[in-house]
UniProtKB/Swiss-Prot annotation:
Gene3D superfamilies: YqgF/RNase H-like domain. Its EC number is 3.1.-.-. This is Putative pre-16S rRNA nuclease. Could be a nuclease involved in processing of the 5'-end of pre-16S rRNA. GO terms for biological process: rRNA 5'-end processing. Disulfide bonds: none annotated. GO terms for molecular function: nuclease activity. It is found in: Cytoplasm. Its main location: cytoplasm. It comes from Mycoplasma pneumoniae (strain ATCC 29342 / M129 / Subtype 1).
Length: 140
């Protein structure tokens, strides 16, 4: 089965989610520590996906849209180049504005505590990034 990988990039952690191209229901995958080494994070992600047997056809990465160039944007561009080299699949950047706030609001609405938010925010934000991407792909 073929999958699309969603990524919520952070300087400390990278949240990931997957959706298969048939069912199209995104679900959280896992969080990867960056530890100041993007190449190692990309290699670990590649290894884990390969071991789990996921065949990727696309990667979608959340990208913050500011009116100025920020350090996080520079880091994401470096990350994208590493991802493209390692995975050899199309990479799409998608606006991630408000994903973390939306995740927090959804968890609070469910009555879950901030501790749950801290543990789940990265993978759930990646899930939202995938949902936004899939919604953009729907024909009008």
């Amino acid at each position: 089965m073929q999958y699309i990988l969603g990524i919520d990039f952070g300087l400390k952690r990278i949240g990931t989610a997957l959706v298969n191209t048939i069912d199209r229901f995104p679900s959280p995958f896992r969080v990867f520590a960056v530890q100041n080494n993007l190449q190692q994070a990309v290699n670990t992600l590649f290894k884990d996906l390969k071991q789990a047997g996921y065949e990727l056809v696309q990667i979608v990465i959340g990208f913050p849209h500011f009116h100025y160039q920020s350090s996080i944007q520079v880091s994401i561009h470096k990350f994208v180049e590493l991802i493209k080299t390692r995975f050899n699949v199309p990479v799409t950047l998608i606006d991630e504005s408000g994903t973390t706030s939306e995740v927090k609001a959804n968890l609070q609405e469910l009555g879950l505590k901030n501790r749950t938010f801290k543990k789940a925010k990265d993978t759930l934000a990646a899930t939202l990034i995938l949902e936004r991407f899939l919604n953009q792909q729907k024909p009008n």
